């Protein structure tokens, strides 16, 4: 158990029960494994490399994870579903609430179909993982969401589309066509389009404007 604003750093696998509390920090330097992990008002850095490119680090929890206002920091090359990313793999159950902070590792943004999987859960997935701050790259704004199918709803993904319900079934029993999800663009994208439109029309004048006011 690590308490009292302690800081630990590991670069080898660790097979143990680890409990962080009282603003403690665990700085992971390489792929690591623990049996159980509790993050209580503390922070875990899955990786904190200085370079722009991500070298994915994996934290494996062979049993259970508990979050109590904990924070997980991950680095992801924000792009499409196949983007390189740090990852947390939990073979057991999750509980509590954890904030997740994602740092972009040089990604330029791309549309995601299913999302970038950053947290995988095998057991009961009762824990909630909440985006700590904005996550964006290129024109896209990313959210942290559960998977939207029965096979993936225990896991957590970085997505940049609006969630839609499945195809509706009509009275004849057939399903309506599936509507493609709508991409979520950065707030700044709207301002860019508006500024571009204004720039393109700024010096477009009517004849009366060019001739001046008639006296």
Predicted features by range, described:
Residues 1-93, 97, 103-104, 108-160:
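Extracellular beta-solenoid/beta-roll
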Residues 33, 108, 155-157, 161-184:
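Flexible, glycine-rich linker and terminal segments associated
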Residues 168-215:
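Outer membrane beta-barrel translocator domains of Type V secretion systems
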């Amino acid at each position: 158990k690590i308490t009292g604003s302690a800081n630990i750093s590991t670069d080898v696998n660790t097979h143990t029960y680890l409990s962080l509390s009282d603003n403690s920090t665990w700085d992971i330097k390489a792929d690591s494994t623990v049996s159980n992990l509790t993050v209580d008002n503390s922070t875990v850095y899955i990786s904190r490399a200085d370079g722009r490119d991500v070298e994915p680090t994996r934290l494996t929890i062979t049993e259970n994870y508990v979050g109590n206002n904990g924070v997980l920091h991950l680095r992801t090359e924000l792009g499409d579903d196949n983007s390189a990313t740090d990852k947390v793999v939990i073979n057991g159950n999750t509980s509590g609430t954890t904030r997740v902070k994602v740092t972009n590792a040089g990604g330029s943004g791309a549309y995601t179909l299913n999302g970038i999987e950053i947290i995988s859960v095998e057991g009961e997935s009762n824990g909630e993982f909440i985006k700590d701050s904005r996550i964006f790259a290129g024109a896209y704004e990313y959210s942290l969401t559960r998977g939207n199918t029965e096979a993936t709803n225990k896991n957590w993904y970085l997505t940049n589309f609006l969630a839609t319900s499945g195809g509706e079934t009509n009275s004849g029993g057939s399903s309506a066509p599936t509507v493609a999800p709508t991409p979520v663009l950065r707030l700044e994208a709207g301002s860019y389009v508006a500024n571009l439109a204004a720039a393109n029309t700024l010096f477009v004048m009517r004849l009366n404007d060019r001739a001046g006011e008639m006296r």
